[in-house]
Amino acid sequence: MGTSAIKYFDLKQFRTTGYRFDFKKMLDDKGNTAVYLFYSYVRICSIYRKLNLSQSDIDELVKTKKIEIKEKAEKNLVNHLLLFNDVIDEVLKDLALNLLCDYVYGIATKFSEFYEACKIQGNDSRILITELCKRFMKLSFDLLSLTPIEKI
């Protein structure tokens, strides 16, 4: 996690701006840090373990169920997830990986709001939204060359 924390702290800065190297800020578990992002990712993995859901169970839900958005937190999260292609276009146009960092941080914060506001257990639609978050976070981590963890 340490290497990813340093790498993320560097990538979240706009490429032409300087910053002060600060381990304390890099390893903070609050705010726009790799530790916070990994905590959100671990939370998703933990939800699946708690609900006894295997990846094949989730894949079956993806094939057979639909997402129904009823709550504001669900809408905010899904709308943010849908920005992915636009964010990637901007990253490529401006050579600004910090925009992808902001995007994945947005997923983490909006997922936290969703988790607090919406009961996931027993709701296939919310499990699917959770899976979307996991997949977009994993894809973002891969693009940023960060190695996520599934347990803390």
Tell me what each language-model feature is.
Residues G2-I152:
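Non-catalytic interaction-recognition regions
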